[in-house]
């Protein structure tokens, strides 16, 4: 697959978005709804280099063409709790197959932990789905974004208790679903 479809996915992600999500906290048997407004903007080459440096990741020769974005969001839960965050992210493709790209997803700030982090990604062009897997200290988050059209995305989040090294993911602690609409 060519990287142009991958780039188009990210071009479609740029803009102002609004999302309604439902989170199922399985360990507490609680369900929570939230509303998030977020903005996705491309980042400069200097910010791409900063994300690489923050993660002690080697600079690839084609850094200027890597998909890199600034994400800014504010979430309000149905309980009135507010969370705001900003971060920069970069996607470095390492393998290409006929309908898939995969590689590393770097952030200068993780969602679950206050530190830079390197995760894995896999992009399926036939489904227009970006699957990101992040290994945190206590959990592993598997986050899916499926682009239905340039103004509608479906989000699915599965968070697992981190298993012992070599064991499969099995103990789900959080399930999240979201509908994300651009320009609302």
Region spans (language model):
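Short, Gly/Pro- and small/polar-rich lid/capping loops
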Residues: 3-4
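Soluble ligand-binding/transfer domains with enclosed cavities or grooves
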Residues: 7-10, 14-184
